[in-house]
């Protein structure tokens, strides 16, 4: 997996993106929030709002399966019919996830060391969205080298324990302070976990 930096983005960067149909090129909604399944470490879809400054929440949601392409400037879908009413599975996930938002969750290593709190989720937008890391802050251990927030790569499977997200202690050697170098850090970290190589 060779990750080009332009394929990585923070989940919060998607908020406000227009949802555009390929059918007519019409912007039919805006992303209100990103629905992230912390247990699966995956992007499930989006809640939506009407376009414009005063656009309120929409009753429909957009499941990831309906997204044709996700870019830095828009979310592309085939047609307006791809939006689902809130009584479907994604809507249920949205409802259930309100009490377990990953933002502000504590990140611990499997050795019991506190790394900080999640401030954002990093998504690889290649063939399909994959959550590959967290941006964290509030770390006395990691942030002195960057003065603020750092990027922590995630393993291919993630342990979630109540309020905390658990990552392998080996993550220390793969933390970066810039998004541009983060893709390579994710690759090296996952390779290290698979093979034990440094």
Language-model features, listed with the residues they occupy:
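Peripheral interaction segments used for macromolecular assembly
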Residues: 1-198
């Amino acid at each position: 997996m060779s990750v080009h930096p332009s394929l990585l983005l923070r989940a919060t960067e998607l908020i406000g993106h227009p949802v555009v149909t390929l059918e007519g090129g019409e912007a039919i909604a805006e992303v209100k929030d990103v629905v992230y399944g912390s247990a699966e470490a995956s992007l499930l879809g989006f809640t939506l709002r009407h376009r414009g400054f005063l656009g309120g929440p929409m009753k429909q949601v957009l499941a990831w399966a309906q997204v044709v392409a996700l870019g830095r400037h828009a979310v592309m879908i085939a047609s307006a019919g791809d939006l689902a009413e809130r009584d479907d599975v994604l809507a249920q996930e949205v409802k259930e996830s309100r009490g377990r938002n990953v933002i502000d969750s504590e990140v611990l290593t499997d050795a019991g060391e506190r790394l900080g709190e999640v401030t954002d989720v990093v998504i690889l937008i290649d063939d399909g969205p994959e959550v590959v890391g967290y941006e964290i802050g509030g770390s006395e251990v990691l942030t002195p080298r960057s003065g603020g927030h750092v990027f922590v790569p995630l393993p291919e499977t993630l342990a979630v324990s109540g309020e905390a997200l658990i990552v392998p202690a080996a993550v220390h050697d793969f933390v970066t302070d810039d998004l541009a170098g983060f893709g390579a850090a994710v690759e090296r970290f996952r390779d290290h976990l698979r093979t034990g190589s440094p």
